[in-house]
Amino acid sequence: MARRTLITVCVIFFLLSLYIPSNGAPLKITDVRYWSAPDHTRIVVDSDKSISYQTFQLKDPWRLVVDIKEAKATFDSRKITIEDSTVHHIRIGKFDRKTMRLVIDLVKPTQSKVFTLNKYLDKPYRLVIDLHRTDLVEEGKKARLKQKSKKYKIIVVDPGHGGEDSGAVGSRGTFEKNVVLALAKKLKRCIDQKKGFKAFLTREGDYFVPLEKRVEIAREYGADLFVSLHTDANFSKRVRGASVYCLSTKGASDEAAKLLAERENASDFIGGVSYASNRDLDSILIDLVQTQTTNDSLRFGGMVLNGMGNVHTIKFKRPKQAGFAVLRATEVPSILIETGFISNRDDENLLRNKSFQLKLAKSLSKVSLNFVDMLAKRDGITVSDGTARKGKGGVHLVKPHETLWRIARDYNTTVDELIRLNNLKKSGHVRAGKKLLLP
């Protein structure tokens, strides 16, 4: 009798479990989004839970298939047309009772990187699919290195944020990523008008570039100056004005600078970066951490504030310092400009205004050009068109204030090659008067 009662109870519990909702409910796919860059496409799948997935590739035609387990969508099957350099279409629909299938129709074979991200701030659980055309990645790198061999001076302008990472948002719905990109393009046009100078952007559209990649781009171009553009935000709508920040390896100049650096450094987490590979930003000790380059950055920052003061409200009269990742590994004078508080209605209206953007770009261009000219005269370098000198196995006598970065560029070689050939320390520090063997 007891055994029969036990069986009856078990059957009842089993039947009830069919009707009682459980924690094992399928995850909901709420959206599928994408961003196109010159050499890659990023696809992001949003969901209400952490995603379990499997991937495989198919040929003739080339496709990447992503199966999302225990999932359903809040929308019907859909087809998203992209038609960029990497992807034709995205198709998503129900594969079987428990699986949603994402099929990505590729232009050519790609190098894919798929990873998940947990909830972060206002971002949901995400599945990120990065598709890189290795041929286009290599072409872009070669093009940047080719510019490095030119004799003209190069200023790399870095429009902050982009793609998934919108940055700060104003009360009128203004995205920081859009404002700084528009300003960066105007700044580039102003710089390019000056003979002997050329400006390049770390991104030219609405797509995400990791902080480490921005640094790498500046290196490949052989930048003489690095300017990162951002907008600030504050809980108080009354706070406004522009400010300039430089790198500090010894802690922030104040708590506000520290908090700002933490916010800007969070860009990778918001934009979506997988940290499976080793990151060396914190361990790199090169010319920038030497006193001369840091002082040059502070001097440049002060000149920028003086110039901007003629066209804009200034919040802090002197540059502040903190551990900004995007400034941490460049070997040239580097600053981060907060062009205003997008949380303030007056600043937001100004930053949206094309005439003001041009006025600000002209001010930044004038100061940047003057500063590079000043450094060139100090270091005994002529700003002109043409190509770099060839080493041909000769010897170079290091001048005061000269860095390995600049020497390598002048002789169309690399810092690593100079370090190897001259048995230098990996910090890259070199003293004036030293004779360097050239490759």
Q: What function would you assign to each model-found segment?
A:
Residues 1-9:
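Bacterial N-terminal signal peptides that target proteins for export
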Residues 9-18:
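Bacterial N-terminal signal peptides
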Residues 22-155, 175, 397, 409:
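Signal-peptide-cleaved, periplasmic/extracellular N-terminal interaction regions immediately downstream
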Residues 45, 66, 104, 129, ...:
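Buried hydrophobic packing residues in well-ordered domains
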Residues 53-55, 66, 285-381, 420:
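Active-site-adjacent mobile loop/cap segments within catalytic or ligand-binding domains
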Residues 136-281, 290-302, 358, 419:
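Catalytic-core regions of hydrolytic enzymes
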Residues 390-397, 414-439:
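Extracellular LysM carbohydrate-binding repeats and other cell-envelope/extracellular binding modules
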